[in-house]
């Protein structure tokens, strides 16, 4: 991971997956397991939580509907249940800039190279190692590193 720029990698992944029906990917991702404590934290603090994912809106629609929180995604034009064209690749740092311009304090949780700039701009950044180790690039700029769901939730409660 991290050997090629995120945008190039993302375009290649979308191209590979474009052979599959969008509805099938959406259904499969809609069944992905969620961290129960994090889900409960989001539900209790819904007005202060936002998801920023580089994934395509048409792929993560069902997953995001389960979480039921404001979200920002990449987008694509879909034709005959297949990706016809990527129309926007989310730059997560733009989401951070938007909320900071509104006067909000931004706590950003990420783990990948594509999170680095957003984490750098956030008021507080948290590198997550809940699923896999964070990219080396984010370790140099993060304020906190968490390995367990309970630890992340305790930290978020302290920061709120």
Walk through the language-model features, giving the residues of each.
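C-terminal cap/substrate-recognition subdomain and adjoining C-terminal extension
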Residues: 35-160
């Amino acid at each position: 991971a991290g050997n090629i720029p995120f945008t190039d990698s993302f375009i290649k992944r979308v191209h590979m997956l474009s052979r599959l029906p969008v509805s099938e990917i959406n259904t499969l991702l809609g069944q992905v397991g969620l961290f129960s404590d994090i889900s409960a934290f989001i539900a209790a603090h819904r007005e202060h939580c936002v998801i920023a994912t580089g994934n395509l809106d048409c792929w993560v629609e069902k997953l995001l509907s389960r979480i039921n929180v404001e979200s920002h995604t990449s987008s694509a034009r879909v034709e005959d249940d297949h990706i016809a064209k990527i129309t926007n690749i989310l730059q997560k740092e733009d989401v951070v800039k938007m909320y900071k311009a509104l006067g909000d304090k931004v706590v950003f949780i990420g783990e990948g190279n594509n999170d680095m700039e957003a984490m750098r701009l956030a008021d507080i950044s948290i590198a997550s190692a809940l699923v896999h180790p964070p990219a080396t690039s984010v370790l140099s700029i993060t304020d906190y590193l968490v390995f367990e769901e309970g630890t992340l939730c305790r930290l978020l409660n302290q920061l709120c």
